[in-house]
Amino acid sequence: MSKRKVAIIGSGNIGTDLMIKILRHGQHLEMAVMVGIDPQSDGLARARRMGVATTHEGVIGLMNMPEFADIDIVFDATSAGAHVKNDAALREAKPDIRLIDLTPAAIGPYCVPVVNLEENVDQLNVNMVTCGGQATIPMVAAVSRVARVHYAEIIASIASKSAGPGTRANIDEFTETTSRAIEVVGGAAKGKAIIVLNPAEPPLMMRDTVYVLSDEASQDDIEASINEMAEAVQAYVPGYRLKQRVQFEVIPQDKPVNLPGVGQFSGLKTAVWLEVEGAAHYLPAYAGNLDIMTSSALATAEKMAQSLARKAGEAA
């Protein structure tokens, strides 16, 4: 099966790590172009050393390159505002081009590979939510497939050193996009997301806490569902793991809790603690927040490439 050529817009931490993943592990993908706006960026320099074509003139530079004619999939690792413009420009030049959005822009549907990749594999633009979303939404979905989830809250704690300028500029978008995806993909009636930039030295690995309030159900069934989901995520993010056993608390009907925006709640509270260790391809191992984004994007693109190859075979 021939490989599909891809380009990455954004030569920062995420874009560079993704490039290295594709070069080392791409099964149906061929790394063709790295796009940046800073001619002195380490990402562009590294791409050139690895034999990848580059441009420092942004998406316009990409579209002016001869390689653009063969590009099937573009990863956008810029910012939410830039992605809206990039999508419009690329779509005008190539209406059928596939975009994988690693910003919080969310022009296309949210995609969390282990939960809903199959139903989004033929979309022209998919959004990878956020690092916190990729880590925690599978846990919310794991509870949702056992019991009705009324409320889910996630706290993503990441090393301050792993948060580049793009992440810092998109904090509000992070919380909004993650909260919405907890509902749309995770299945919660109401979602809330909090991000913490941890300044500790030496930097700590990404840690995530997930609280889910659901109808009462078998705790064994919920724990089994969560463990099964964690194993499924590990298939493409090997450093993803439960930090300890799942904890439960029954909230009785005669002692309900009041949830802002939800009201009185009684039922089952499920608490999940996660840790995500990065693969250290380009970024340090503590930057699991960035690794889970690039790994999820890679898994999505691989499926898209297979789908495109099948369609090309059927049309031949």
Swiss-Prot record:
Molecular function GO labels: acetaldehyde dehydrogenase (acetylating) activity; NAD binding
Origin: domain of life: Bacteria
Entry annotated with the keyword GTP-binding: no
Catalytic residues (positions): C131 (acyl-thioester intermediate)
Disulfide bonds: none
Classification via SMART domains: Semialdhyde_dh (SM00859)
Enzyme Commission (EC) number: 1.2.1.10
Binding site for NAD(+): S11, G12, N13, I14, S162, A163, G164, P165, G166, T167, R168, A169, N170, N289
Pathway: Aromatic compound metabolism; 3-phenylpropanoate degradation
Gene Ontology BP terms: 3-phenylpropionate catabolic process
Catalytic activity: acetaldehyde + NAD(+) + CoA = acetyl-CoA + NADH + H(+)
Keyword Oxidoreductase: yes
Record's keyword terms, sorted: Aromatic hydrocarbons catabolism, NAD, Oxidoreductase
Quaternary structure and partners: Interacts with MhpE.
Function: Catalyzes the conversion of acetaldehyde to acetyl-CoA, using NAD(+) and coenzyme A. Is the final enzyme in the meta-cleavage pathway for the degradation of aromatic compounds.
Family according to the record: Belongs to the acetaldehyde dehydrogenase family.
The name this protein goes by in its record: Acetaldehyde dehydrogenase
